[in-house]
């Protein structure tokens, strides 16, 4: 009986880890839909340009406050990070908590699925705006 309980526990842990990895991977198509909330200010793709907010092409591996020609807030200039999935998720969950004084008015994405999906969508775009 004890071996059955251990087997059940091991299977539960394996399932939880697998489920967590599925969330972490993100779905670019779902992320594109969530990104519609961001399009009022941000752009991606071959014709993207800075507008109310910086364009987000090539965000994966890009230094913060580095979109050429965009006038970032002083707190954002001082952030000094390189964007990766973990940094993006921490920021987009609550932008004003991560960067007090940011000009970004968006309140954030509380859903970890939405965060992962938007990252999966954005990270498809290279610095030239073409999908990788």
From Swiss-Prot:
What is one Pfam family matched by this protein?
Cytochrom_C
Which Gene Ontology cellular-component terms appear in the entry? periplasmic space
May I ask which residue range the UniProt record assigns to the signal sequence? Answer: 1-24
Q: How is it modified after translation?
A: Binds 1 heme c group covalently per subunit.
Q: Name one GO molecular function term.
A: metal ion binding
Q: Which UniProt keywords apply?
A: Electron transport, Heme, Iron, Metal-binding, Periplasm, Signal, Transport
- The entry marks the following residues as binding heme c, namely 38, 41-42, 104
Q: Which domain of life, per UniProt? A: Bacteria
Write out the annotated subcellular location. Periplasm
Annotated Cytochrome c domain ranges read 26-126
PANTHER family in the record: CYTOCHROME C
Q: What is this protein called?
A: Cytochrome c-554
